[in-house]
């Protein structure tokens, strides 16, 4: 039997463990955070979203990306269900690749106030050109191992 979060004012506001509606837009989406039980330890947490989708703001055509989000938590952890809902809210949102990638990184950084965060947005080609976008909050804390994001360069069929 899975362990349930104890009910408290902090946990009752979470989307985790409850049925919630998909947010209609990134602005409507809520990012939840939970206390970090290892806040005295520097470590890296990684979220990977290999099937992120959004819309081109000009043509309305779908755009696809492989997102990799690495962060060194401070006092808070990013709750993964809320991240999933937030990323899904971009499905009908129109924005350029650079704006999507940087906005996601900034929103997460604001929500959880990590010691460090980076996001890599590896966008699939539109018009024959793949676009990769990278953003981070500052320098990596000393002594923290940051693995490579391991997303190969786009090669097409060649």
From Swiss-Prot:
Binding-site positions, substrate: 78-80, 97-98
Location(s), subcellular: Cytoplasm
Regions crossing the membrane: none
Gene Ontology molecular function terms on file: preQ1 synthase activity
Record-listed E.C. numbers: 1.7.1.13
Protein name, as recorded: NADPH-dependent 7-cyano-7-deazaguanine reductase
Annotated family: Belongs to the GTP cyclohydrolase I family. QueF type 1 subfamily.
Major place of residence: cytoplasm
Function: Catalyzes the NADPH-dependent reduction of 7-cyano-7-deazaguanine (preQ0) to 7-aminomethyl-7-deazaguanine (preQ1).
Database matches in Gene3D superfamilies: 3.30.1130.10
A Pfam match: QueF
Keywords: Cytoplasm, NADP, Oxidoreductase, Queuosine biosynthesis
GO biological process, one term: queuosine biosynthetic process
InterPro entries: GTP-CH-I_C/QueF, NADPH_dep_7-cyano-7-deazaG_red, QueF, QueF_type1
Active-site residues, as the UniProt record annotates them: 56 (thioimide intermediate), 63 (proton donor)
Catalysis: reaction(s): 7-aminomethyl-7-carbaguanine + 2 NADP(+) = 7-cyano-7-deazaguanine + 2 NADPH + 3 H(+)
Pathway(s) this gene product operates in, as recorded in its UniProt entry: tRNA modification; tRNA-queuosine biosynthesis
A Gene Ontology cellular-component term: cytoplasm
Main enzyme class: oxidoreductase
SUPFAM superfamilies: Tetrahydrobiopterin biosynthesis enzymes-like
């Amino acid at each position: 039997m899975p362990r349930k979060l104890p009910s408290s004012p902090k946990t009752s506001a979470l989307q985790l463990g409850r049925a919630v509606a998909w947010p209609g837009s990134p602005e409507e989406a809520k990012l939840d955070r939970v206390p970090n039980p290892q806040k005295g330890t520097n470590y890296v947490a990684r979220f990977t979203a290999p099937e992120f989708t959004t819309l081109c703001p000009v043509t309305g055509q779908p755009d696809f990306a492989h997102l990799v989000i690495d962060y060194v938590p401070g006092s808070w952890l990013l709750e993964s269900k809320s991240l999933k809902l937030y990323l899904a809210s971009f499905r009908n949102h129109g924005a350029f690749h650079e704006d999507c990638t940087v906005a996601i990184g900034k929103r997460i950084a604001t929500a959880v106030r990590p010691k460090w965060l980076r996001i890599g947005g590896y966008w699939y080609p539109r018009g024959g050109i793949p676009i990769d976008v990278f953003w981070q909050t500052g320098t990596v804390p000393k002594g923290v191992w940051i693995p490579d994001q391991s997303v190969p360069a786009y090669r097409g069929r060649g």
